[in-house]
């Protein structure tokens, strides 16, 4: 069974382990989530729970949103996501999910929206190598051959310049260094996708190494 929680990335800091090792960590504020809906194999074809995070003003919501959250006896939520293969039987609609679902040392996957970089060339966007910068070369930071003679067309998937970032990214197998139940904080080893204050999903690792 998978477990998860929604939160907001606060930023990065460092903590000392018991052996004196300095560990870089990302601080995630995961205030209590509310179970808005339960999905089962019988009714929806798969098992999942729908979580809501952070209240939203009713003025900014429509009638379907208000009705959906009213069934869980809660206010409209800003961030709503599903946690697949969750323990559907162990949770009820309207129940709160807190940071104590995770423990120190557990391995998790964190999903967020990567930082937007704007329009970038192929070297920054795809990691291509640049051409010679001297000796008469006129090829420096270009995308490379477009096949103008043969095959006389541009192949699908050709790596070109374009808008970079703003994609959904999941970083797998991150260790939880500390769980602060008083302040609803998770300290995760390493970095996670997104800018400060961006919304993230923390789930139990899918491909944890044994």
From Swiss-Prot:
Disulfide bonds: none
Region (Disordered): 125-151
Record-level GO cellular component terms: cytosolic large ribosomal subunit
Top-level taxon: Bacteria
Record's keyword terms, sorted: Ribonucleoprotein, Ribosomal protein, RNA-binding, rRNA-binding
Role played: One of the primary rRNA binding proteins, it binds directly near the 3'-end of the 23S rRNA, where it nucleates assembly of the 50S subunit.
Name under which the protein is recorded: Large ribosomal subunit protein uL3
Source organism (scientific name): Bacillus anthracis
Top-level taxonomy: Bacteria, Bacillati, Bacillota, Bacilli, Bacillales
Gene name linked to the record: rplC
